[in-house]
Amino acid sequence: VENLNSYEYTLIEIWEADVSGREDSVWKKIEAIGGEQGWYYGTILWKTRGAVDKLLGGIGYRKGRPFRELRNGDQVDFWRVVGVDKSRKYLKLQAEMKLPGKVWITYEIKANRFFQKIEFIPKGAFGRVYWYLVKPLHYFIFTQMFRAIVK
């Protein structure tokens, strides 16, 4: 288990939308994310990021996921399921790619609200610089993914 005390703070971005009457259809999209389905937007960009990761000695873009309901510990491309609860419509994935920090993406439906949350804990100055350099691209990609899931 890695000691997260060596990391400084958490940077968070949250998207939120009203999905009244569509909670189940939105959850079905969340449950199916990754693998053959892709990421609803920018899958080629995710594959490119995976190629860069492989060059840096990481795992690369491991396309795939189980063909059943997700469980804790399952692989979803280069993410790992670290929290899933179908009854709460909750899914949390942790990135396994090479990064100057730790990153998670959480999808959750509470009542009639759908949330997509990105959490990044940078490691050192390079982690903070990395976050701010990629933030515009990540913001665009994650916004488009969010819109596609809500649609």
Model regions and ranges:
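Intrinsic-disorder/low-complexity, polar/charged segments enriched in Ser/Thr/Lys/Arg/Asp/Glu/Gln
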Residues: T10-D18, Y90, W104, R113-F115
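Hydrophobic ligand-binding cavity/cleft-lining segments
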Residues: V1-G60
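A residue-level detector for short acidic-glycine micro-motifs
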Residues: G83-D85, A111
